[in-house]
């Protein structure tokens, strides 16, 4: 779609500001020694860099593997997250091994390769998760500081609620009393009304029960259907780069950010000593190894794939496995790279009696798309000022159903409580095929399937070997099947009688228009169409201090290693059940306080 591929010149170079703290040349750095080195300037690393440099005497170096995305149109337009995530300019595009449980397909994970990390290319969802998710994390780690009551102030600290643009009346779409007013990351209600919004509201009022509307899913009790909230400011994407790395913070003389700098190893100055430095190279340079020293700590925030890859290459992992890679072990931490956890999702599409579904208009009507882009460029309003969905459905399995009861008896209930969802549906106006349609993205948000991240035996320093483990648990397939039935139930409301035509080809075999269910066809559809949910976590999971399992203690310190912490999505012992962006911001905020308090 050429009309959406507008870019500013010199995308891969960085215009160094007059403050001289954003660099693309290591030779221009003022020093090779800092108090803290943060590996990765993404969703978590940005928070750490910002908060640690609030003390003007603390010197911080951030090493980011990607370029700066400042001023790049495709990273600013909210609606563009439908198109931009796979662009290799901004994305590591992590390929996984063929998944024999998903028709032997090779799936691709987006991972932000840009200052600001995956917050630059994600769906911008503002979701804190159920309170019980956080209470479970506190119980698993033995640290009450991870409970909902203790983490809640960090949500408020990081957020600033802002008005929607374009004059939309957002009354009743959220509860302002539970949102931050003076934080760093801007949030808002949707900026655009879809033609299906009134139909959704009518259907909710008709069906009730699990489809009952709720005011705000960020109060810790998210079950029901609510308006989405987004990390957006004045009609533009709000991300880690525009918030925690805003110009006023990059202007600090003690914050030094080097882009296009990939860290190869964390290192010790002597065997058995603390980690006190890194080796890295510049992607836009000669590839020669460069060095930087941390006087206090090295903090790894390289993400769910990058963090275990870096730890393993540094000799932190299972000793025998490391030896097979010809990597010299420095710490025996066997769980590094294990426990890869992600939602699985399948997109459900129905043809509709309409010619104006938004996504279809944008992708099939170039005049409309160009006009929408022009409107956004002029005023940051219009359809491009919004995310792709206005409503989120958070549902539990129907525990009065004997089949559900049997599955829960066999596999246990992986949700954190009876107030947390198993299923999330996201309504999208548009979809697959040549005609007009609506879609519902169907996620299992309490997956039992697990994967792994390891090194390539022939090239350990090359891209990681990722086995997503998608749909390895029959429970996950069952939950996706139940999600399909829940979506069909919602679309059976009379509000849709003159709008919905039929399920799309493939889906129609599992849920024919006669109302029957073909479970064999449904499973086949899921295994051939399901993909990763792009909320991957868990590969450096947190466990109680002193535990022999896990990778980091509750204060993020890597087990059996001094001077090294991990702060990013990889530390979650269980995947948050409502997106991951905001939980990552929250844990990084607390990590910054813990780090400050330890020195």
UniProtKB/Swiss-Prot annotation:
InterPro entries: FAD/NAD-bd_sf, GMC_OxRdtase, GMC_OxRdtase_N, GMC_OxRtase_C. Coiled coil: none annotated. GO terms for molecular function: flavin adenine dinucleotide binding; oxidoreductase activity, acting on CH-OH group of donors. Gene3D superfamilies: FAD/NAD(P)-binding domain, Glucose Oxidase, domain 3. It holds the Pfam family GMC_oxred_C. Residues 1-20 form the signal peptide. FAD binds at residues 43-44, 64-65, 122-125, 569, 580-581. Its cofactor is FAD. Disulfide bonds: none annotated. Homodimer. Dehydrogenase; part of the gene cluster that mediates the biosynthesis of erinacines, cyathane-xylosides that show unique biological activities, including leishmanicidal activity, stimulating activity for nerve growth-factor synthesis, and agonistic activity toward the kappa opioid receptor. The role of the dehydrogenase eriK within the pathway has still to be determined. This is Dehydrogenase eriK. It comes from Hericium erinaceus. The lineage of its organism: Eukaryota, Fungi, Dikarya, Basidiomycota, Agaricomycotina. The gene is eriK.
